[in-house]
C-alpha cells in the first residue's frame, strides 16, 4: 500500500478550512466583502492551517476546534499581509494587486482590522483560557513586529538580534502558535507539546530566512512581486547584512556606504548594485543560518513519538527548506 502524502491526507480538512474562511469574511459591508475576497482569492500555501491540523492530529482531538483554530490563525496572517502591503506601499501580493491598490488605503486598514476581529470571533466558543492567552499574545507579537518593521525601514545598521526578533514576530510566531495551539487543542502531553512548539518556531525562522534569500535570488514571475522588494522598501535582511560583513572583512566598505545613504527615492541603479552584491556575498551565509534553524526543527521533530503524522511533518519540513518560492 502506498502511503499518502501530507497533501493528500490534509486535503479534506484544508477544503473545510477554505470553506470556513469564505464564511468568516462575509459582512454587511459590500466594500469589505470585496476587499476580503480579493486577498483570500489570491491564494496562499495555507502553511499555518497545515501545522495546526497536523499538530492536533498527534493526539485525539475535537476536529471542529482544530478547524476553528486553523481558520483564525490564517485570518490573522491575512490581516498582517494587508497591513504590511499598506505600510510598505507594495503594489503586488502573490501576483495580484495589493488591497490598498485594488481599493484604497482606508479600505486596506479597515479590512485588516475586520479580519483580526473575525479571527477572534471565530474562536470565541473554545473554552480554554490558556488557548486564548496564547492566541492574544500571538496577535500582540505580530503587531509589535509591524512596528519593528516600520522602525527599521531605511535605518541601517540593524543588529543581528533585532533582525531575529523581527522575523520571529513577522513569521515564526504564527507558525509556532499554529503548532502550539494545535497541540493544546488535542491535549497532547507536555513534553511533546514543547517539542512541536519549538519545531514550529525553528521552521518558521528558517522559512522566513529562505524568504529573505529568495527576495534576492528568485524572479518576479515566481515571487509575484519585484526582485529586491525588501531593500526597495528599506528592509535590511540577513542576506544584505551578511554581504556587508563579508565585504568589510575584505576592506571593502562601498556596499555599507551605499546602504547607509539609501532612501525611498534612490535610483534604480543603486538597488541593482545592492542586489548584485548580495547575490555574490550574502546568499551562502544566509543559507547556512536557515539550515541551522532547519536542523534545530528536525531535532525537535525527532523527539516526537513515531507516527504517520510525524512522517507528514518531516515531509513538510523537507519541502519547506527546499522551496523556491
UniProtKB/Swiss-Prot annotation:
PROSITE patterns attached to this UniProt entry: POLYPRENYL_SYNTHASE_1 (PS00723), POLYPRENYL_SYNTHASE_2 (PS00444)
Taxonomic classification: Bacteria, Bacillati, Actinomycetota, Actinomycetes, Micrococcales
Any single biological process term in GO: isoprenoid biosynthetic process
Entry EC no(s): 2.5.1.83
InterPro entries tied to this protein: HxpDPsynlarge, Isoprenoid_synthase_dom_sf, Polyprenyl_synt, Polyprenyl_synt_CS
Residues that bind Mg(2+) 1: 84, 88
Binding site for Mg(2+) 2: 84, 88
Organism: Micrococcus luteus
Known role: Catalyzes the condensation of three molecules of isopentenyl diphosphate with farnesyl diphosphate (FPP) to yield (all-E)-hexaprenyl diphosphate (HexPP; C30), the precursor of the prenyl side chain of menaquinone-6. Large subunit Hexs-B catalyzes the condensation reaction and the final product chain length is cooperatively regulated by both the Hexs-A and Hexs-B subunits using the whole size of the hydrophobic cleft as a ruler.
Protein name: Hexaprenyl-diphosphate synthase large subunit ((2E,6E)-farnesyl-diphosphate specific)
PANTHER family: ALL TRANS-POLYPRENYL-DIPHOSPHATE SYNTHASE PDSS1, GERANYLGERANYL PYROPHOSPHATE SYNTHASE
CDD domains xrefs: Trans_IPPS_HT
Keywords: Magnesium, Menaquinone biosynthesis, Metal-binding, Transferase
Amino acid at each position: 500500500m502506498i502511503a499518502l502524502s501530507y497533501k493528500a491526507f490534509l486535503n479534506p480538512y484544508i477544503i473545510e478550512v477554505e470553506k470556513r474562511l469564505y464564511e468568516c469574511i462575509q459582512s454587511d459591508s459590500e466594500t469589505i466583502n470585496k476587499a476580503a475576497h480579493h486577498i483570500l482569492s489570491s491564494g496562499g500555501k495555507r502553511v499555518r492551517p497545515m501545522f495546526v491540523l497536523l499538530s492536533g492530529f498527534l493526539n485525539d482531538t475535537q476536529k471542529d476546534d482544530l478547524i476553528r483554530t486553523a481558520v483564525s490563525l490564517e485570518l490573522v496572517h491575512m490581516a498582517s499581509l494587508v497591513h504590511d502591503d499598506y505600510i510598505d506601499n507594495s503594489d503586488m501580493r502573490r501576483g495580484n494587486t495589493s488591497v490598498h491598490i485594488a481599493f484604497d488605503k482606508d479600505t486596506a486598514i479597515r479590512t485588516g482590522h475586520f479580519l483580526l476581529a473575525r479571527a477572534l470571533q471565530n474562536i470565541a466558543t473554545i473554552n480554554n483560557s490558556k488557548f486564548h492567552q496564547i492566541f492574544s499574545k500571538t496577535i500582540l507579537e505580530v503587531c509589535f513586529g509591524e512596528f519593528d518593521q516600520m522602525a527599521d525601514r531605511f535605518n541601517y545598521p540593524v543588529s543581528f538580534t533585532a533582525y531575529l526578533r523581527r522575523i520571529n514576530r513577522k513569521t515564526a510566531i504564527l507558525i509556532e502558535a499554529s503548532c502550539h495551539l494545535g497541540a493544546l487543542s488535542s491535549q497532547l502531553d507536555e513534553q511533546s507539546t514543547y517539542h512541536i512548539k519549538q519545531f514550529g518556531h525553528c521552521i518558521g525562522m528558517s522559512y522566513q530566512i529562505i524568504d529573505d534569500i529568495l527576495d534576492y535570488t528568485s524572479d518576479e514571475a515566481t515571487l509575484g512581486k519585484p526582485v529586491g522588494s525588501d531593500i526597495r522598501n528599506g528592509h535590511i535582511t540577513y542576506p544584505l547584512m551578511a554581504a556587508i560583513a563579508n565585504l568589510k572583512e575584505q576592506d571593502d566598505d562601498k556596499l555599507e556606504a551605499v546602504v547607509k545613504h539609501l532612501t525611498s527615492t534612490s535610483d534604480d541603479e543603486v538597488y541593482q548594485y545592492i542586489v548584485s552584491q548580495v547575490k555574490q556575498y550574502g546568499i551562502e551565509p544566509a543559507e547556512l543560518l536557515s539550515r541551522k534553524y532547519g536542523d534545530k526543527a528536525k531535532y525537535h521533530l525527532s523527539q516526537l513519538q513515531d507516527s504517520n503524522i510525524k512522517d507528514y511533518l518531516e515531509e513538510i519540513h523537507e519541502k519547506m527548506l527546499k522551496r523556491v518560492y
